[in-house]
UniProtKB/Swiss-Prot annotation:
RNA-binding as UniProt keyword: no
Known role: Plays an essential role in the initiation and regulation of chromosomal replication. ATP-DnaA binds to the origin of replication (oriC) to initiate formation of the DNA replication initiation complex once per cell cycle. Binds the DnaA box (a 9 base pair repeat at the origin) and separates the double-stranded (ds)DNA. Forms a right-handed helical filament on oriC DNA; dsDNA binds to the exterior of the filament while single-stranded (ss)DNA is stabiized in the filament's interior.
Binding residues for ATP: 146, 148-150
GO CC field: cytoplasm; plasma membrane
Region (Domain IV, binds dsDNA): 320-447
GO biological process: DNA replication initiation; regulation of DNA replication
Species of the source: Kosmotoga olearia (strain ATCC BAA-1733 / DSM 21960 / TBF 19.5.1)
Protein name as annotated: Chromosomal replication initiator protein DnaA
Quaternary structure note: Oligomerizes as a right-handed, spiral filament on DNA at oriC.
Region of interest: Domain II: 66-102
Domains (record comment): Domain I is involved in oligomerization and binding regulators, domain II is flexibile and of varying length in different bacteria, domain III forms the AAA+ region, while domain IV binds dsDNA.
PANTHER family with a match to the protein in the record: CHROMOSOMAL REPLICATION INITIATOR PROTEIN DNAA (PTHR30050:SF2)
Entries under SUPFAM superfamilies matching the protein: P-loop containing nucleoside triphosphate hydrolases, TrpR-like
Amino acid sequence: MSNRIISILKKRLARKTWDNWFTTFQVKKVTDDKIIFSVGNLFIKDWLQSKYGSVISKAIKEAYGKNLDYEIVYETTEPEAFNKSNESYKGPLVKKKPLLISNLNANYTFENFVVGPENRVLYEVSLEISRNPGRYNPFFVYGMVGLGKTHLLQAIAHKIMELHPEMRVLYITSEQFMNDMIDSIKYGSVRDFREHYRKKADVLLIDDIQFLIGKNGVQKELFHTFNELYDAGKQIVICSDRNPEELNGFHDRLVSRFQMGMVMEICPPEKDTRFKIAKKFAERESVSLPDDVAQLLADSVDGNLRILRGVIIKLIVQSSINKERIGAALTNQILAAFNKTTVSIKRMKEEDLIMSTIEAVMGVSPEEIKGTSRKQNIVLSRQLLMYILKRHHGKSIKEISKITGKRHSTVIHSIKKIEMSVIKGNTVVKEKLAKILNTMATSSAAG
């Protein structure tokens, strides 16, 4: 009977689909009320559950004449990253099928990425890269924490594997790249490490590249990996919390490589987009979020989507436990709790965090920033505040003018001043900006 399920699936699915996703799919165990299938790849397990669940259920019903629950398990012995005995690198690329990599989140797809006008062009470029890998190369995406960079990066990986199943797609964090390099040195497998990253990947996607700031040895290895992949026409996609010019502590030659292709910013979602995202997050948890609650969340929570999702999850859990309707009262209660612990709720004013960080780094108080002093250090602090508010937090010129008490023309001039300093490689400005951003990132992570 178990063979019958496999036969039914083969008939229902296109040959290409079967070859791409079902070659390791098999029946492991059958009980009176449940069937357990096994696959040889963790990503395939998640992919089959999310994309082919209904097909599998129908095949079970056809084979057994009734509906049965099923489970897909991943069964394989977990290899060591580097095997000391044979010095053979056992990285995350699947050799039997040119799929992948490290784990991808099955929810991080283009279909689940809510697109607003602020990121429409970025979305379309990402789709085009998925359709035609190598067209925009490299592709560098930057933006503040929690805006969906990882989602977008993994969506590109998912789509390339869907449209180009023959391609080997490697998604990693920069920390993973560093750890793999360290292991290769430890176990004498540097050659295998380089073979893995430079020869076996058709698409390389690296998340959180800013992690490698100051890590010169790893940057050198990445530089040569980048060059070899680029020269071979392989697609490279990189994400960072800041634009390439602000990667202070990176080799100039590596920064210049990042700037060779398409560099785009992912912007904080506007209020209408946050409303749609809130509805989407709840829908993913099988909950229909009332419009007034979604609007309240969109009004109250800033662009950090991790915080927005956290509020929604807590809202759903508390509603379920207390048998309480999801409404404005419960939402306000949960927002108040988050308000005590995070700066991502608008009532806590992100500009206060930036100004307090500038005070710690530059020794200039918020009062001095908002004042009229023309002392060089105060003017620079004021300009850095305006630049960060605009480029990293998506504030409008009008909003920045209101926060700082300065005229629109002053705000525009200040932002352009910092932009030009960064582009021209002004060491003082780049170092101060990097220190402020790093301090803020550390504070956010600690919170």
